[in-house]
Amino acid sequence: MAAEEHALTSTEYIKHHLTNLTYGKMPDGTWKLAENAKEAQEMGFSAIHLDSMGWSIGLGIIFCLVFWCAAKAAKADVPSKFQSAIEMIIEFVDSSVRDTFHGKSRLIAPLALTIFVWIFLMNLMDLIPVDWVPMLAQIVGAHVFGMDPHHVYFKIVPSTDPNITLGMSLSVFVLILFYSIREKGIGGFVGELALNPFNPSNPVAKALLIPVNLILELVTFLARPISLALRLFGNMYAGELIFILIALLPFWIQWALSVPWAIFHILVITLQAFIFMMLTIVYLSMASEKH
């Protein structure tokens, strides 16, 4: 349990572990690190979650370096275990793309690989004991920057931050729009929204049903990035919260509960990365289809 447990109640302990390291502009015009959730809220859209951004970028760099090293060390005759593992991941993603995406694009397979591995690495951070990195951040904040340890927040699981998951899903949404307009044209894209799901042969009925179709299709279309983001965020946030609740229990109970939950959570970590990747492929495949 965290070193500050004697000073914090259980509720404060949970809130502390679920609060991001936030930097932003205060209403008085000053830029600073938020010392509590209220200050972070006052920063509004100028607030930046430094921990989520830092870990996301860092894990992205690790992903690129690992695959770059694998490519540099690749051998055609006798592949190493490391090369074999990387090739298995690539072949798995490539087969998923070939089975699901029916359009023609060189972007989809690299995009799917990036999404799967990057989200998997972000989710994997949830297996690090909840107090280790925050305690280190408190020590650094107190001794290097002279900060109050109780005001040092540091989350290490980027996928438990809705800003990160929404950012990724909105990027996918932009690609969906791009492929839809590229393959169908603006007229075809608008027509697809206006003439589905109800498309009677009678011209009058067709015209009357256009507003209904637009409402239904726009809601469905706009719900895709939101559901994509919230599904990943919700599952990972719940998993992190359970680890935090386990950390509040006596030491001898923690191991009895945390180990089985961590083993089960490995499945959740992998499954959520896979679901995000597959839904991205499916949505882009639908956008690439010509009707």
UniProtKB/Swiss-Prot annotation:
<dbReference type="InterPro" id="IPR000568">
    <property type="entry name" value="ATP_synth_F0_asu"/>
</dbReference>
<comment type="similarity">
    <text>Belongs to the ATPase A chain family.</text>
</comment>
<keyword id="KW-0406">Ion transport</keyword>
<keyword id="KW-1133">Transmembrane helix</keyword>
<keyword id="KW-0813">Transport</keyword>
<dbReference type="GO" id="GO:0046933">
    <property type="term" value="F:proton-transporting ATP synthase activity, rotational mechanism"/>
</dbReference>
<feature type="transmembrane region" description="Helical">
    <location>
        <begin position="48"/>
        <end position="68"/>
    </location>
</feature>
<dbReference type="GO" id="GO:0045259">
    <property type="term" value="C:proton-transporting ATP synthase complex"/>
</dbReference>
<dbReference type="InterPro" id="IPR035908">
    <property type="entry name" value="F0_ATP_A_sf"/>
</dbReference>
<dbReference type="GO" id="GO:0005886">
    <property type="term" value="C:plasma membrane"/>
</dbReference>
<keyword id="KW-0812">Transmembrane</keyword>
<keyword id="KW-0472">Membrane</keyword>
<keyword id="KW-1003">Cell membrane</keyword>
<feature type="transmembrane region" description="Helical">
    <location>
        <begin position="108"/>
        <end position="128"/>
    </location>
</feature>
<comment type="subunit">
    <text>F-type ATPases have 2 components, CF(1) - the catalytic core - and CF(0) - the membrane proton channel. CF(1) has five subunits: alpha(3), beta(3), gamma(1), delta(1), epsilon(1). CF(0) has three main subunits: a(1), b(2) and c(9-12). The alpha and beta chains form an alternating ring which encloses part of the gamma chain. CF(1) is attached to CF(0) by a central stalk formed by the gamma and epsilon chains, while a peripheral stalk is formed by the delta and b chains.</text>
</comment>
<keyword id="KW-0997">Cell inner membrane</keyword>
<keyword id="KW-0066">ATP synthesis</keyword>
<keyword id="KW-0138">CF(0)</keyword>
<feature type="transmembrane region" description="Helical">
    <location>
        <begin position="161"/>
        <end position="181"/>
    </location>
</feature>
<feature type="transmembrane region" description="Helical">
    <location>
        <begin position="262"/>
        <end position="282"/>
    </location>
</feature>
<feature type="transmembrane region" description="Helical">
    <location>
        <begin position="241"/>
        <end position="261"/>
    </location>
</feature>
<dbReference type="InterPro" id="IPR023011">
    <property type="entry name" value="ATP_synth_F0_asu_AS"/>
</dbReference>
<comment type="function">
    <text>Key component of the proton channel; it plays a direct role in the translocation of protons across the membrane.</text>
</comment>
<dbReference type="GO" id="GO:0042777">
    <property type="term" value="P:proton motive force-driven plasma membrane ATP synthesis"/>
</dbReference>
<keyword id="KW-0375">Hydrogen ion transport</keyword>
<dbReference type="InterPro" id="IPR045082">
    <property type="entry name" value="ATP_syn_F0_a_bact/chloroplast"/>
</dbReference>
<protein>
    <recommendedName>
        <fullName>ATP synthase subunit a</fullName>
    </recommendedName>
</protein>
<dbReference type="Pfam" id="PF00119">
    <property type="entry name" value="ATP-synt_A"/>
</dbReference>
